[in-house]
UniProtKB/Swiss-Prot annotation:
It is a multi-pass membrane protein. The lineage of its organism: Bacteria, Pseudomonadati, Pseudomonadota, Alphaproteobacteria, Rickettsiales. One of its GO terms (cellular component) is proton-transporting ATP synthase complex. The gene is atpB. PANTHER family: ATP SYNTHASE SUBUNIT A. Key component of the proton channel; it plays a direct role in the translocation of protons across the membrane. This is ATP synthase subunit a. The keyword Ion transport applies. Belongs to the ATPase A chain family.
Length: 242
């Protein structure tokens, strides 16, 4: 019997907490976000707490992730982006660990929920907007009118650019949530047929599952990278008005 592949995304209360009429219960989603944060902090503390001239494997892996983030900022924002390394690095690591936690058997994929990814996207959107106005003042609004636009086309271009700008949180959040959900649904559906397929195809389904799991891990890493690099592109608009 095929189990509902959407059950794995159910949010369950672990500790029921209510303050007046507000439900602020501690859920499996909150637990996995907390666990991912603690694990990430522990990982990078161990990687960088005692740096060596001849680095350990843990230090090398931590440096690779750090250099990846700094390269993203340098390539998309330039030297002015260095001050945003802590924010972008935290964003990338949090999404990466949450994505990878979903690959653990009986784990929970936090980033498959649009409310989580939308909250992250809104934070990026607010940061970009605030940085833009703080750095450029009202001149930041020139972002919505590309240089060289004919005067008669200006009203239409402003509307299009404004709509595109406001749609950024939706596109960022939907891309991440949809990709994580689709991949896990596919794995769940195929895994439910593995036992049946083994009767007819012997051990062939096992390598297939290994390949699919490997591909899903790749997607988890890729989606964290895409979310972060798009955040850098948006940040470039605020810093350099490009």
């Amino acid at each position: 019997m095929l189990h509902n592949p959407l059950v794995q995304f159910d949010i369950k209360k672990l500790i029921d907490i209510k303050v007046m009429d507000f439900d602020i219960s501690f859920t499996n989603s909150a637990a996995y976000m907390l666990l991912a944060s603690v694990l990430a902090l522990t990982y990078f503390y161990l990687a960088f707490s005692n740096p060596r001239l001849v680095p350990s494997r843990l230090q090398i892996s931590g440096e690779i992730i750090y250099n990846l983030v700094t390269d993203m900022l340098n390539q998309n924002v330039g030297s002015k982006g260095r001050k945003f390394v802590p924010v972008i690095f935290t964003l990338f690591v949090f999404i990466l660990f949450c994505n990878l936690f979903g690959m653990i058997p009986y784990g929970f994929t936090v980033t498959s929920h649009i409310i989580i990814t939308f909250a992250l996207a809104i934070l990026v959107f607010l940061m970009v907007t605030i940085v833009g106005f703080v750095k450029h003042g009202m001149h930041f609004l020139s972002l919505f009118l590309p240089h060289g636009t004919p005067l008669w086309l200006a009203p239409l271009m402003i509307i299009i650019e404004l709509f595109t700008y406001l749609a950024r949180p939706a596109s960022l959040s939907l891309r991440l949530a949809a990709n994580m959900m689709a991949g896990h649904i596919l794995l769940k559906v195929i895994a439910s047929f593995v036992v049946t397929l083994m009767i007819y195809l012997k051990f062939l389904p096992i390598p297939l599952m290994v390949i699919l799991i490997g591909f899903e891990i790749f997607v988890a890493i890729l989606q964290a990278y895409i979310f972060t690099i798009l955040s850098c592109v948006y940040l470039n608009d605020a810093v350099n008005l490009h």
